[in-house]
């Protein structure tokens, strides 16, 4: 927003994140804070580097802080930059209110966020094995979503991952498949929803076009008018997603 610039997680190297920000004419020194969802390396790889270099504040819940302490990704960060954002709470950052909510993932206390400003909201929801009815209610009827479409089940099962890792991904503490993500959207989107971004796609176990097609097809079968009432949009860890207004 005009008053606050926030980064959710920093799962890439600091140099890579700096380059991606430049693609949308932003600089890391403009960021006020990083909100951390959980301690897995693909979400905190660049957290420590960015915090030390640019002095930005870091927010996570207490259990996640404990899980991050001592990791090479966090390293030594000034205590004044460390802040608690407990699960199930709402914090105000300048002109935006942010609600945290828990998800089902194999981390200490994973949480994601709903961003609210001027009567509109945007939900980020990835890294969860399933979406419960309670969670669906918490994130319902947002103006926009970033929803996980992590894997295609058949590609994952036929792929080279160890069976134990496949079981983890497919479990209730794993990740949403393309079908799971579409089902979650069918249960949560509302009349105000205009944009659905597909995120956290596995490079090994998914294909961008397949994820997109699965989402659109399942929404269409549920009589939801893709392209008329709302649009489905792709994201990639290799390129910056264009800025958009919600």
What kind of feature is each model-predicted range?
Residues 26-29, 50-54, 77, 137-141, ...:
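Short, conserved loop/helix-junction motifs that constitute active-site signature segments
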